Regions:
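A conserved active-site cap/scaffold subdomain adjacent to cofactor or substrate pockets
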Residues: 1-26, 30
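An alpha-helical appendage that flanks or caps ligand/catalytic pockets
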Residues: 20-126, 158-164
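Hydrophobic faces of well-ordered beta-strands that scaffold small-molecule active sites
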Residues: 9-13, 42-49, 129-133
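Short, solvent-exposed amphipathic alpha-helical segments in soluble enzyme
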Residues: 6, 64-68, 148-149
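Residue-level preference for long, well-ordered alpha-helices that form the structural scaffold
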Residues: 18, 104, 111, 139, ...
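Generic C-terminus detector
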Residues: 123-166
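Active-site-proximal loop/turn and secondary-structure-junction residues that shape catalytic pockets
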Residues: 15, 50-52, 137-139
C-alpha cells in the first residue's frame, strides 16, 4: 500500500522471523513504488532488534529475559519480562534451546564492534541507511547502555550525558 500511494515504508525486522522475508518485502516496495506529491523516490526504514553490551557474555545474559519471555509466550504464558538473574537460572530443554537458536538468528546481539558490523550488514541487505533499534530487556539501564554503546561505536555527535533528562 505504501508503494502504491508513494509513501515511506517502515519494516519491523524484529517480529519473530520476519527478517527472513524482509529483504524481499523491501525489494517489492521499491519495485512497485509510485512517485507522489509527498515522495518522489522510495524511502525505506528498517527497525532491528539489538542488544549491545561491553562483552558478548553480558549481552547474552541481558537477552536471557527476552529468551524466557519468548518460550513462555509459546506456552500461552504472559508475564512481565523477568530479570536476567531470574531468567538465567531457568532450565531450558534441548527443544527450547533449538527454538531459541532459530529465533535469535534474527537478533543482533553482542559487543559494540559486533553490533556495528551486523547493523551495517543489515543496511546493505535492506538497501537503506535509515535504521531504528528496538531493545527488549528487563532493566532500563541495560537498554540505555546498549543505545549509548551503539551511539559511541557509530560516532554519533550527541550522547545524552544527564540520564535524568530521559
Amino acid at each position: 500500500l505504501a508503494a502504491a500511494l508513494g509513501l515511506p515504508f517502515s519494516f519491523a525486522d524484529f517480529f519473530g522471523t520476519t527478517s527472513e522475508h524482509g529483504p524481499l518485502v523491501a525489494e517489492l516496495y521499491r519495485e512497485y513504488f509510485r512517485p507522489s506529491g509527498y515522495l518522489k523516490q522510495p524511502r525505506l526504514n528498517v527497525t532491528l532488534q539489538v542488544i549491545c553490551a561491553e562483552t558478548q557474555k553480558k549481552a547474552e545474559f541481558i537477552a536471557s529475559s527476552r529468551n524466557i519471555s519468548r518460550l513462555e509466550s509459546l506456552k500461552g504464558i504472559r508475564n512481565p519480562l523477568m530479570s536476567p538473574e531470574e531468567a538465567s537460572s531457568i532450565e531450558i530443554t534441548p527443544y527450547e534451546l533449538k527454538y531459541l537458536e532459530k529465533v535469535n538468528k534474527h537478533v543482533i546481539l553482542g559487543t559494540p564492534n559486533v553490533v556495528k558490523e551486523k547493523i551495517l550488514e543489515a543496511t546493505k541487505i535492506y538497501g537503506t541507511d535509515d535504521v531504528n533499534i528496538a531493545t527488549n530487556c528487563h532493566y532500563f539501564d541495560d537498554r540505555l547502555n546498549s543505545f549509548e554503546l551503539i551511539a559511541e561505536t557509530f560516532d554519533l555527535s550527541k550522547i545524552v550525558e544527564d540520564r535524568s533528562q530521559i
